[in-house]
A protein has these predicted regions:
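Alpha-helical substrate-recognition element adjacent to the catalytic core
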Residues: 4, 10-120
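Short loop/turn elements that form and flank the Walker-type P-loop nucleotide-binding site
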Residues: 23, 137-138
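Surface-exposed amphipathic alpha-helices with a cationic face
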Residues: 73-77, 134, 155
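Short, high-confidence coil segments that cap the C-terminus of an alpha-helix
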Residues: 81, 138-140
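Short, structured coil segments at secondary-structure junctions
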Residues: 106-107, 156-158
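Donor nucleotide-activated moiety binding/catalytic core segment of transferases
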Residues: 121-137
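Acidic, divalent-metal-coordinating active-site segment for phosphoryl/phosphodiester hydrolysis
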Residues: 125, 130, 146-157
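Conserved SAM-binding loop
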Residues: 143
Length: 158
């Protein structure tokens, strides 16, 4: 079944979406930190040395939504696409992650988090997540992520 692809235009500083073409439903990945969630207020915990990852993650309860990206996720879901959350957050932060998604009306089909003791780079962790997604029947074709290295990894594994 084909679903409409979306075009974004901006008028009076407000985004507006319109249907332009029909496309098959897609599996679409969204990152959390820096993509759906504004982490500006807690970035300092990991930009200085030593990095304080515990404080960084504990402060996620104060994250603000990135409204434009959330709107895209909502519209894509409404158009029939499957939304997959792939985050570098450790699994122990599953509850606040799901709460953020719920509080911001982000419907999703699956959530993938890193293991609690997995300290590998995001590119490695998310590549492994991609293999798990495919094992679970997903075939992501689009990804929204704020890190260039992760975006490049998604491209290389297309």
């Amino acid at each position: 079944m084909a679903t409409p692809a979306l075009r974004l235009s901006v008028s009076n500083n407000r985004p507006r979406f319109t249907s332009i073409i029909e496309s098959d439903p897609k599996d679409i990945i969204f990152d959390m930190d820096g993509t759906l969630a504004d982490i500006t207020h807690r970035r300092h915990y990991v930009e200085s040395k030593p990095k304080n990852w515990d404080a960084f993650y504990r402060a996620m309860i104060n994250d603000k939504p990135v409204e434009a990206v959330i709107m895209v996720a909502q519209l894509l879901k409404t158009a029939g696409h499957r939304i997959i959350i792939a985050t570098g957050r450790p699994r122990r932060y599953n509850i606040p992650t799901l709460r953020f998604l719920q509080d911001n009306d982000i419907s999703y089909d699956a959530v993938y988090l890193r293991g609690d003791t997995d300290y590998r780079p995001d590119t490695v962790v998310k590549e492994q997540m991609l293999h798990k997604m495919r094992d679970n029947g997903y075939n992501p074709t689009i990804a929204f992520d704020d890190r260039k290295s992760v975006v490049e990894m998604w491209r290389l594994n297309d």
